Regions:
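Short, well-formed alpha-helical segments that are part of the catalytic scaffolds
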Residues: 12-26
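Short aromatic/hydrophobic "clamp" motif used to bind/position activated sugar donors
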Residues: 85
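Donor-binding/catalytic cores of nucleotide-activated saccharide
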Residues: 69, 90-224
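Membrane-interface aromatic/basic loop that binds lipid-linked glycans or pyrophosphate carriers
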Residues: 270-368
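Cell-envelope/extracellular polymer assembly enzymes that use nucleotide-activated donors
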Residues: 2-5, 23, 33, 185
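A conserved acidic beta->alpha catalytic loop
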Residues: 23, 30, 38-47, 67, ...
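Short beta-strand/loop segment that forms part of the nucleotide-sugar
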Residues: 31-40, 60-65, 90
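Glycine-rich, basic loop-to-helix element that forms the pyrophosphate-binding segment
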Residues: 64-80
Length: 368
């Protein structure tokens, strides 16, 4: 039985795959298995995996019709034999001693998870300095008790972490399929059942940031997955309830939800408003009243107007039910007022022109 199982989803990664597999093959800690999960590749990636499997028995090949990275990782979880779990993306690569050092960190510190640093590399092979990429920076060092603040200040990426397989199986931790940002949900689930963590401030993982990667598309308004974090929150809350953890982690859930909602409201497409609003209402109904009221203010048109999201504020005013928006008349007036824009102001001639919904409605001129 291997000590570490490394799960590697593979989909049309032929351009990068050999570099990734070579980095796994030369690990200084040899007692590993590499589960290459082919997600219906069409570019010869499967043949590359087969080549490595024939040359090194530690490589294993699993296959599925194209179903996305979450389903591929779940297939890897079901077939992993190791005591510890690690993940890698097919366009990234490990430093030669990442397995050895993370294993030593988690065992020596007797913690439930160990986390290392990473190097972020643009596709042109330019290494980005850590100060330019605050999200990936480690804000802790050594052994730490896991708190809500620590969970939120630590990046959710899977590839710079080592997990205990027993904890994953005990609590049924897995990935929500069909959505992007599935690694968020796995991370939240695991950290809610783990008690301690060890941080290793060494850059042992090389993350290639591509323009067409999930993270590269985060700030693209046309990306349909930009609000998938809301769906992953649904999955996360179901996990908490299934394991009777919702009360213990109520504060954490609310904080994560507010952060996700604040992020998503700036990027939602008008066609996505109804579904996002539906998810919001579901949480509002199942959470305790005090928590629900806290979430409620983040869907209030007044709050959304402050964020500059006029269209979503308008949508909620027109579709809000059950008193969600508080004093509906006030909110509607605020939304209408937000559409009242200063068209032209000339101090020299003392002329003011106003527009409403693009139509000029008022022109004032001071008498001489």
């Amino acid at each position: 039985m291997p000590i570490i199982s490394i799960i590697l989803p593979v989909y049309n990664a032929g351009k990068y795959l050999r570099k990734c597999l070579d980095s796994l093959k030369v690990q200084t800690f040899p007692d590993i298995e590499i589960l290459c999960v082919d997600d219906g590749s069409q570019d010869g990636s499967r043949r590359i995996c087969e080549e490595y499997m024939l040359a090194d028995k530690r490589f294993k090949l699993l296959s599925q019709p194209n179903s996305g990275p979450a389903a591929a990782r779940n297939l890897g979880l079901r077939n992993a034999a190791g005591r510890y779990l690690m993940f890698c993306d097919a366009d990234d690569w490990y430093q030669p001693d990442i397995c050895e050092k993370l294993l030593k960190a988690i065992t020596a510190s007797q913690t439930d998870i160990a986390i290392c640093g990473c190097r972020v590399i643009d596709e042109g092979e330019q290494v980005r300095p850590q100060e330019d990429i605050a999200y990936y920076r480690l804000y802790y060092s050594g052994k730490q008790q896991i708190t809500g603040e620590l969970i939120q200040r630590t990046n959710v990426m899977l590839w710079n972490k080592i997990f205990k397989a027993d904890l994953v199986r005990q609590y049924g931790i897995d990935f929500p399929t069909g959505y992007e940002y599935d690694d968020n949900c796995f991370y939240w689930q695991y950290m809610c059942v783990a008690k301690t963590v060890c941080f290793l401030n060494e850059e042992l993982y090389n993350y290639l940031r591509r323009n067409d990667s999930v993270m590269g598309k985060v700030y693209n308004r046309k990306n349909k997955g930009v609000y998938d974090s809301l769906y992953s929150l649904e999955y996360f809350y179901d996990f908490l309830r299934r394991n009777s953890l919702e009360k213990r982690h109520q504060r954490l859930f609310v904080d994560i939800y507010q952060n996700c909602w604040r992020f998503c409201t700036g990027f939602l497409d008008e066609r996505q408003y109804a579904q996002a609003y539906k998810i919001f209402n579901r949480f509002r109904r199942i959470l305790p009243p005090d928590v629900s009221s806290e979430l409620k203010k983040h869907c209030c048109p007044r709050y959304l107007l402050r964020l500059g999201n006029f269209k979503l504020a308008e949508f909620i005013c027109l579709n809000g039910k059950d008193g969600l928006t508080g004093c509906r008349l006030i909110d509607i007036r605020l939304v209408l007022f937000s559409k009242l824009t200063l068209f032209n102001l000339s101090l020299k001639n003392a002329v003011v022109r106003l527009k409403f919904c693009g139509l000029r409605i008022l022109r004032l001129r001071q008498r001489k």
